[in-house]
């Protein structure tokens, strides 16, 4: 059974685009990454999956249950951490955790105490006295304390210091090994690369790439670093070129034979060809038609976005159906 299954899931805010025809399958027990900058549709996707907003079209299921008709049963098995960390002022941490557990009719005190200890969170503190990072810890405990089968996390590490980020991902890894499905929405690509087995990239409300993290990182692009002088003018497929002190480095997705001929015509003292990291691949997908790049900034996906055509060249009209293990839906 899939933990998450969407079929042409669509959300418009009036005439403004939210998400368009999302076809997504996340297997039970998978650690799945969802990548995109502000306004791409990440948070809209998550809020629609959780029934917090109603879709304009299409359908979605969580563990085989329809999100529109069986929301209460879905929430019993789901832990959700929003990108914001907002709570009722004046409440103490323990009261927030008790309220969250009560909504699921669960006694989570023992698990909450364990999580508070690991995250160095003091339950007696008032939430409005906490820093943003500590409020994020409260949100983490709320999402995890009932030991859900599915964790949906929207930009969870913003505000956490590096040590707490590491502890947080240790906890997620433990839960995933125990069988929980993790759906991680993030703009921090190193988090996706270290922790996720598969990922989807969303742009302007559409999934434009979906594959294993290894396959996305490999892509068909190579990072090339050359020491010496090589005639690269007119060679197609070069991006992100950087020249410094007799060394040129660039991403290359063109004909490798043509590149080798260029090396033969030049003077090369050293050469390195390596796989790009996920961040470089991601920026490739977000490259605009004129070769410039869209800004990729922190924060959660906006609820609204611009309409109109995509502007990133050959992949502009591509909409990927994201099945399991690369299969098409």
Per-range role (PLM):
Residues 222-289, 293, 297, 302, ...:
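Short, charged/small-residue-rich alpha-helical element at the C-terminal edge
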Residues 58-69, 73-74:
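Conserved ABC transporter NBD signature motif
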Residues 140:
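Hydrophobic anchor residue at the start of the ABC signature
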Residues 151-155, 160:
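Catalytic Walker B motif of ABC-type/P-loop ATPase nucleotide-binding domains
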Residues 109-129:
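Conserved ABC nucleotide-binding domain
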Residues 168-253:
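ABC transporter nucleotide-binding domain
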């Amino acid at each position: 059974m899939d933990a998450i299954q969407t079929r042409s899931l669509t959300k418009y805010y009036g005439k403004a685009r939210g998400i368009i025809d999302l076809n997504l399958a996340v297997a039970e027990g998978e650690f799945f990454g969802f990548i995109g900058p502000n306004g791409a549709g990440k948070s809209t996707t998550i809020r629609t999956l959780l029934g917090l907003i109603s879709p304009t079209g299409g359908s979605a299921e969580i563990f085989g249950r329809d999100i529109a008709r069986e929301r209460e049963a879905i929430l019993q098995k789901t832990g959700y951490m929003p990108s914001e960390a907002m709570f009722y002022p004046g409440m103490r941490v323990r009261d927030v955790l008790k309220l969250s557990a009560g909504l699921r009719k669960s006694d989570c005190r023992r698990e909450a105490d364990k999580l508070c200890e690991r995250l160095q969170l003091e339950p007696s503190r008032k939430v409005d006295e906490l820093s943003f990072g500590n409020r994020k810890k409260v949100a983490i405990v709320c999402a995890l304390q009932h030991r859900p089968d599915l964790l949906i996390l929207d930009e969870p590490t913003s505000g956490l210091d590096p040590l707490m980020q590491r502890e947080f991902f240790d906890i997620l890894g433990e839960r995933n090994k125990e069988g929980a499905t993790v759906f991680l929405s993030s703009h921090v690509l190193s988090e996706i690369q270290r922790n996720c087995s598969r990922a989807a990239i969303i742009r302007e409300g559409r999934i434009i790439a979906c594959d294993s993290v290894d396959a996305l990182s490999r892509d068909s692009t190579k990072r090339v670093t050359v020491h010496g002088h090589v005639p690269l003018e007119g060679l197609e497929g070069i991006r992100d070129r950087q020249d410094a002190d007799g060394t040129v480095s660039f991403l290359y997705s063109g004909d490798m034979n043509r590149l080798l001929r260029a090396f033969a015509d030049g003077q090369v003292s050293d050469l390195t060809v390596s796989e790009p990291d996920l961040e470089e691949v991601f920026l490739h997908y977000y490259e605009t038609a004129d070769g410039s790049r869209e800004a990729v900034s922190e924060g959660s996906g906006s609820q609204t976005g611009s309409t109109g055509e995509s502007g990133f060249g050959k992949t502009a009209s591509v909409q990927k159906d994201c099945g399991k293990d690369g299969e098409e839906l």
